[in-house]
Amino acid sequence: MISVNDFRTGLTIEVDGDIWRVIEFQHVKPGKGAAFVRSKLRNLRTGAIQEKTFRAGEKVSKAQIDNRKMQYLYANGDQHVFMDMESYEQIELPAKQIEHELKFLKENMEVFIMMYQGETIGVELPNTVELKVVETEPGIKGDTASGGSKPATLETGLVVQVPFFVNEGDVLIINTTDGTYVSRA
């Protein structure tokens, strides 16, 4: 059991018979009344996001998640195939279950597959990934310090806002948590 006062982003908990990952949380101490913790949770089975409020000091169960290192192989229709790096066992995950992660997955990329009591519940990406720009407007010559941005389409289909100096063919480092540009690789 873990106290809601000890919540941190990325923590995996068990609430109402489901497995949730803490996305955001905020400790609130109103002037009148008891303190509470407002949290935003992602259901690891369905991908649904729910806001939940807990009383300060309330206890919840910490879910024991096993991470298996796997390699993303390919998409097979609506299924995505991953291979265990040690046993060469292959598993398939439906696109609906890993919708957010698909924007960052490239073939042969190594990721962690999250397992809960023998059930595959999702993909854990690295904090950042390197993706190639396949389409963007050409930069304006000499415009390096204006601080503006333009949209760029990456090799996975993800569209991110990038600085004007980024060109087609550049490899960028992208934050997988919020899908934002970090830097050039």
From Swiss-Prot:
MF term (GO), any: translation elongation factor activity
One cellular component (GO) term of this entry: cytoplasm
GO biological process terms on file: peptide biosynthetic process
Record's keyword terms, sorted: Cytoplasm, Elongation factor, Protein biosynthesis
SUPFAM superfamilies: Nucleic acid-binding proteins, Translation proteins SH3-like domain
Pathway(s) served: Protein biosynthesis; polypeptide chain elongation
Gene3D superfamilies, sorted: 2.30.30.30, Nucleic acid-binding proteins
Pfam families: EFP (PF01132), EFP_N (PF08207), Elong-fact-P_C (PF09285)
Compartment annotation: Cytoplasm
Primary localization: cytoplasm
UniProt-listed SMART domains: EFP (SM01185), Elong-fact-P_C (SM00841)
The organism's place on the tree of life at top rank: Bacteria
NCBIfam families: efp, PRK00529.1
Family as reported in the entry's similarity comment: Belongs to the elongation factor P family.
Role noted for this protein: Involved in peptide bond synthesis. Stimulates efficient translation and peptide-bond synthesis on native or reconstituted 70S ribosomes in vitro. Probably functions indirectly by altering the affinity of the ribosome for aminoacyl-tRNA, thus increasing their reactivity as acceptors for peptidyl transferase.
Protein's name in the database: Elongation factor P
